[in-house]
UniProtKB/Swiss-Prot annotation:
Sequence segments annotated as region (Disordered): 1-128, 141-196, 264-303, 447-499
Chain intervals with Acidic residues compositional bias: 466-476
Subunit structure: Interacts with CHC1 in a Ran-stimulated manner. Interacts with XPO1. Interacts (via its C-terminal R domain) with SMAD2 (dephosphorylated form via its MH1 and MH2 domains); the interaction results in the nuclear export of SMAD2 and termination of the TGF-beta signaling. Interacts (via its C-terminal R domain) with SMAD3 (dephosphorylated form via its MH1 domain); the interaction results in the nuclear export of SMAD3 and termination of the TGF-beta signaling.
UniProt modified residues of type Phosphothreonine: T56
Source organism (scientific name): Macaca fascicularis
Intrachain S-S bonds: none
GO biological process, one term: protein export from nucleus
Modified residue annotations for N-acetylalanine: A2
Annotated Gene3D superfamilies: Pleckstrin-homology domain (PH domain)/Phosphotyrosine-binding domain (PTB)
Compositional bias of kind Polar residues: 57-66, 116-128
Official protein name in the record: Ran-binding protein 3
PTM annotation, UniProt: Phosphorylation at Ser-58 promotes its import into the nucleus.
Bias (Low complexity): 481-499
Motif Nuclear localization signal, chain ranges: 49-57
Length: 499
């Protein structure tokens, strides 16, 4: 029977360590083995498969029955060896067996470190916790003999010690990370950030450049980025150039700057007005200059601008020239506004010479004290001389109408006697006609007196002949008077037509 038993049940091989594969194996839905918890733990990466060990005796090499394997529910997991820490061999823990079993805990979230880790983990589990390389490397280091020699209580103590050291390690790692961040904090604050605290950097760069150069001459360091910051150097140089240019251009005129000083400045206006008064001292009188200099203390912008332009304006004044008209030695008797017409023989019509001021002047003769008169007429505006004739005894004068007078006078253009027509108001025409008639009669009487004085005393036989001569003279004068009257009638008709 013993031989049959040996043939049916093969001998149990010595315990062998089973390593976890890269790919997780799914548990079958119908499986109800007591190692289901181990399969669930195997799915996560932070689990090392336990070593199946059974008690062996040197006497019997046959395995016990399945009931004995199920009755022994304790399965010992190999300790997780951490590099640099030895497993603690202390007293067995007094915790119950339910707590001695390793319970799956969530991953501990740690703050990201500024520097990348030098060692990278090849793979990770489903819950994000990286696989420990020590798990695969530490298990082969333990031989089956050492595992078999350890008691269950010692193994449980080692597992608990490792669990207690893991949070301590996490805390220590967090503390070290905080210290590293605190150490790197000042370094990052000292580092240059583009556009940050630009005013402080620009203001202090002129003061601290010399000191930094003296300090860094012997031992240059990388903590002073301003020494090599070309942007700040350019800003400092541009600021220096701007200050220099501002000092240089401060004396130049800027439109709209210091308007109150430039416009409403009484001293400046007084200086300008005084200079202008000096230039125009020869032209203006003292009273006018003093009145211009006296300006009110408070004046509006328009008044000040007008005063400034008046003071600075250079007036081109012509020298006063004495006007010589030739009438200085004559006394004016009558002047009137009128129109002057001249009779054209070729066209038999009246041609207007112009309108202006007609003056009747009297002048005493130097020879015998007799009165000499003349008519002078100048155009209005240009004062062009259009009539200048003396009154003589044979001058013909006739009143053509109520507002016109026809006279014979010397023409200034061709120096000949022509017939002129003077048209004016009825009042002026009546005064002019009366004045001319009175002077012509006086001239005629004087001519007659001169002729009588020159004539010798007549003989008694020669008297009839003289009477005949006088009658002949009267006959000669009569036709001339008739012709003059006919011309006067014709002139009246033409005057009415022209007017």
């Amino acid at each position: 029977m013993a031989d049959l038993a040996n043939e049916e049940k093969p001998a149990i091989a010595p315990p062998v360590f089973v390593f976890q594969k890269d790919k997780g194996q799914k548990r079958s839905a119908g499986g109800s083995s007591p190692e289901g918890g181990e399969d669930s733990d195997r799915e996560y990466g932070n689990y090392c498969p336990p070593v199946k060990r059974e008690r062996t005796s040197s006497l019997t090499q046959f395995p016990p029955s399945q009931s004995e394997e199920r009755s022994s529910g304790f399965r010992l997991k190999p300790p997780t060896l951490i590099h640099g820490q030895a497993p603690s061999a202390g007293l067995p823990s007094q915790k119950p067996k339910e707590q001695q079993r390793s319970v799956l805990r969530p991953a501990v979230l740690q703050a990201p470190q500024p520097k990348a880790l030098s060692q990278t983990v090849p793979s990770s589990g489903t819950n994000g916790v990286s696989l420990l390389a020590d798990c695969t490397g530490a298990v082969p280091a333990a031989s089956p003999d050492t595992v078999a020699r350890r008691s269950p209580s010692e193994a449980a103590d080692e597992v608990c010690a490792l669990e207690e050291k893991e949070p301590q390690k996490n805390e220590s790692s967090n503390a070290s990370e905080e210290e590293a961040c605190e150490k790197k904090g000042p370094a990052t604050q000292q580092a240059f950030v583009f556009g940050q605290n630009l005013r402080d950097r620009v203001k202090l760069i002129n003061e601290s450049v010399d000191e930094a150069d003296m300090e860094n001459a012997g031992h240059p360091s990388a903590d002073t980025p301003t020494a090599t910051n070309y942007f700040l150097q350019y800003i400092s140089s541009s600021l220096e150039n701007s200050t220099n240019s501002a000092d240089a251009s401060s004396n130049k005129f800027v439109f709209g700057q210091n308007m109150s000083e430039r416009v409403l400045s009484p001293p400046k206006l007084n200086e300008v007005s005084s200079d202008a008064n000096r230039e125009n001292a020869a032209v203006e009188s003292g009273s006018e200059s003093s009145s211009q200099e006296a300006t009110p203390e408070k004046e509006s912008l328009a008044e000040s601008a007008a005063a400034y332009t008046k003071a600075t304006a250079r007036k081109c004044l012509l020298e006063k020239v004495e006007v010589i008209t030739g009438e200085e030695a004559e006394s004016n008797v009558l002047q009137m506004q009128c129109k002057l017409f001249v009779f054209d023989k070729t066209s038999q019509s009246w041609v207007e010479r112009g309108r202006g001021l007609l003056r009747l002047n009297d002048m005493a003769s130097t020879d015998d004290g007799t009165l000499q008169s003349r008519l002078v007429m100048r155009t209005q505006g240009s004062l062009r001389l259009i009539l200048n004739t003396k009154l003589w005894a044979q001058m013909q004068i006739d009143k053509a109408s109520e507002k016109s007078i026809r006279i014979t006078a010397m023409d200034t253009e061709d120096q000949g006697v022509k017939v002129f027509l003077i048209s004016a108001s009825s009042k002026d025409t009546g005064q002019l006609y009366a004045a001319l008639h009175h002077r012509i009669l006086a001239l005629r009487s004087r001519v007659e007196q001169e002729q009588e004085a020159k004539m010798p005393v007549p003989e008694p036989g020669a008297a009839p002949s003289n009477e005949e001569d006088d009658s002949d003279d009267d006959d000669v004068l009569a036709p001339s008077g008739a012709t003059a009257a006919g011309a006067g009638d014709e002139g009246d008709g033409q005057t009415t037509g022209s007017t």
